[in-house]
């Protein structure tokens, strides 16, 4: 297979030997697998949108590398378990329309999200009782009840109040106060770095082989993630390409529909978990920085619990399948995107499940349709990756019975009174270990791995850092040297 891939790759290179390249173009051309779906941070829910919005907008608070909350905009005091007072810091950033971020913008953004049931962020702030402006520099937030992780929920992009009041279309023309401003164009996604005018152009190239090919031909300057291991290995051996990598904290997983007559049986979910040889998949198809996962958060996160490893056990899986359906195979449908690498993983999982008596049909969809189906609960099984999660309250949003969309992220309609009660207790104690263990016992989802991060770029590129959560913050300091 690797020999065939290399031959095909070299053949494709020969076809484009005379293709134009961007080596004299000052813009950095960033090849991405999926383009952002929504550049309004109040409504964005896909990974590409969140990564790009993080460049365009300034957040009230953000997570540092130790998963602690920091803010360049405000300091705060906890007056009581339900009252917080915030004070503006000096040297606040300017919005890209020229106005300076102020207290009106913060309050307007929060009030707008609270009042809009269509925003996925609204659930984060349902516990806010009221916001009170104390002065031009200070404001208070009063909660309905105590929330030990409330500050972590304030990781929200601030929008200009004047544009909010005018119903500005932030999705089509985002205006933030981050390190990059959006450059309106008819058919391209371009950002300009405020401090020096460096332009980043984001180019959607869905096929990873084509993405790597364009990198070799200098039609693009850099790619990050979403590359099969054979492509990574090939690029590592190219003298014109530099590679940087790190461990990852984003979890790839399989989701289930718990309204399904078959998948609501925990025995079937257990059988599926034991039938998939994750170790083999990681060893042969993912990069060396990928780690097996048993829970949402990676081991370095403070909320991570000590769990027993789910072992590959096809014999026990077969026995469970026979106990459920002794006379015939079980038929299920698995949805995934058209990305060739994700399709390859799905095909291997299909073959592994066939060995234990599960007939898995793979249905591929374009990214927009696929993600819409997931959001609407239109699936039996699906494969996806949670990106950038850091607040343990995510467990409530994914697994509480009242968190069915649009009130939360429980897209599989998971319902467990025991877990509901454990979640309620964890929200108060901030001890999530019992919740995490019970979710594993019930196979509330099937964790696969924390996929390692890798960036490949031409020698013209320097100062790009890869982050554990796969964000694009490395673009804040990236440099392109046209004289290379």
Spans of model-derived segments:
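N-terminal lobe/hinge region of extracytoplasmic solute-binding protein
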Residues: 32-81, 111, 175
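Aromatic- and charge-enriched surface segment that lines or borders ligand/interaction sites
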Residues: 52, 75-118, 214, 262
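Surface-exposed binding/hinge segments that line
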Residues: 87, 121-164
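Gly/Pro-rich hinge or "lid" segments in bacterial periplasmic/extracellular proteins
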Residues: 146-201, 207-210, 315, 319, ...
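Detector for C-terminal structural segments
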Residues: 186, 275-303, 340-350, 374-484
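Ligand-site clamp/hinge motif
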Residues: 187-233, 359
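Local pocket/hinge segments that shape ligand/substrate recognition
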Residues: 199-202, 224-314, 337, 407-417, ...
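Ligand/substrate-recognition segments at binding pockets and active sites
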Residues: 322-388
